[in-house]
Amino acid sequence: MTAEDASVPGDDRRDQMLRAAAEIIAERGFSETRIADVARRAGASPALVIYYFGTKDHLLTEALRFSEQSFYAAADQMLSGLANVRGRLEGLVRLTCMPQQTDEIPGSWGLWFDLWSQAFRHPAVARDRVELDQRWRNMITRVVDDAVAAAEIDKIDSTEFAVTFAALLDGLSIQVSLQDPVVDADRAYRIAMRFASQALGFAWAPTRRRRAAKAGGPA
């Protein structure tokens, strides 16, 4: 450990390394990221990065967890301020499909691409992938269960809905992240909300405000 390594509290130093790893993996991809690159950007030694994370695979999963913190913090705050299922699901879809809705790492969807690729071949990464995906499904399930309890919607298999809706949002978000010329953020938003409203039985239609904003009118 260098003198510079020792000058920063452990938790802060770990966060610095995770942010550096998340940024570099998002920029270059997992295969092109080296421990030395992460150490250099974080102002740490490669030995310290290895001390904290052991392997590059583990660094990837921890970097993704770090980048997801801002997403879930924003989601929890958003959900607490909305009173109905339609507004809550609209908020979750915007956080998922609209670019940079939170203070997340730029290009953070690239971390998920690399995680999925590594999970296909590495059991330890696969286990982490299951945990991360389940956290997302659990949030959707909670939104639906709360709506059922409040008599906003009829009783439904919330777990089944969450699995389907999460998979739909994953697919749409991939297209948006890849800048697909057919599936942009607005279309992804409309598709997701149309599905949710039909599956859960609440009224929904794109607002005039959104159409005006897309056409270049006032927001």
State the predicted function of each range.
Residues 27-31, 81-82, 150:
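Short coil/turn segments at alpha/beta junctions that flank glycine-rich nucleotide-binding fingerprints
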Residues 55, 121-123:
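Short loop-to-helix capping motifs
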Residues 1-12, 19, 204-219:
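N-terminal intrinsically disordered/low-complexity leader segments
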Residues 65-70:
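Short, basic, alpha-helical segments at the C-terminal edge of helix-turn-helix-like DNA-binding modules
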Residues 16, 20-58, 62:
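Helix-turn-helix
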Residues 62, 76-109, 161-165, 211-212:
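Hydrophobic alpha-helical connector segments
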